[in-house]
């Protein structure tokens, strides 16, 4: 009883503190602490004391100065860390992108590092997470919102603030490095940091409060390590207006399948009868369904009783389909309107050997020297750059097309693929055999679909951002098993375009001096 009461008060404290946003200048203290977001107490990684990590906010044009102070002590979740600011282009600050051994050496425990980057031309919904091994699964993951004072969608909603951010988290009772290499499902789904597991049927659920007659811009963020979720709110349609930081033409849906690391803004009109309505986030595998309030939260109208909903789910009739998404403002597709009509086309063949994933016959093994440091030290060609077979130089100012055919040889589909440093045009989506060179959505994480559907997802982007940029499956357990490559973009200009601070240059000597137990 004592532990349960303690866990209840810990949960209350976490909820109370997790709503306070920080930024654009902030200190992030990364530490180990016991948490119980689903009523089960476990050691985890907290940022400024909370799980999920606190909301970071700013506005378009801001300079973000985010000082990461590593005080980690538990080697089973790693003592070092490195943070990726997901969705930001990091033009001129490739060193601040975050992936360990691609863009930097990890920050050692007992040290801090300042991520200092500008966001001149991006606004929308982003997130941040550890980019070292599977560390973000243990708690280092949180939402990041950049507001646009001139938001073209502003007339469509009345409320857009800290209370309208919705995070979806797969939560595990065992630390990622101590559990199975490929877990068969999470113990709980957390919505805004709260949820229930099979062993904690009375744990608190998140409550999202609305007032009748108001329109809310909700920012749905998948901070998942693995599953995708089908998200819906009983009795309400959702109007999607933003996709991964890209404004989109308004699209009315009644459910959203959201893959790991994707984000959507949707407008909800609180025009239904005052009451309580189930918010649902059903994972694609593991403990599915909603029995006893699992995979759920509560939408509560002002004036409704403090009670769990009694609403029932209806069959989705207008689910979100990616090919129905289009940018709000015209965004020309790089290249010419034919398959392969680009300066450089690459096909990525996926494989798996029971332990590791492969792309074009290479599994990504983190190099001891970060790719950016290799380039700054003079490495220029694929032959020079490590890991061998996993680094693809891309020419400057060129159009690039990547095909990612789904295959039964790479189990665990659909695999959501994320490209760092860019948003890309999705010219062929999962579930579709047609190519759209006119007005496809641009985004930074795309589902590569399933072999059963014969999917051959195809994306395009322009090389306008010198630096090494990771492309990888965002199922963190798959990334840790090598499901990644690096694009070394415009290698000749990387050094001039990305001046590195001295503190960055100090990271590797410090990290390389650590014993394995202190890494």
UniProtKB/Swiss-Prot annotation:
Glycans are attached at residues 74, 161, 228, 237, 271, 353, 361, 456. Cu cation 4 binds at residues 415, 473, 478. Disulfide bonds join 105-508, 137-225. Residues 1-20 form the signal peptide. It is found in: Secreted. It comes from the Eukaryota. Cu cation 1 binds at residues 84, 418. One of its GO terms (molecular function) is copper ion binding. Keywords: Copper, Disulfide bond, Glycoprotein, Lignin degradation, Metal-binding, Oxidoreductase, Repeat, Secreted, Signal. Binds 4 Cu cations per monomer. Cu cation 3 binds at residues 131, 420, 472. Its EC number is 1.10.3.2. Belongs to the multicopper oxidase family. Lignin degradation and detoxification of lignin-derived products. This is Laccase-2. The gene is LCC2.
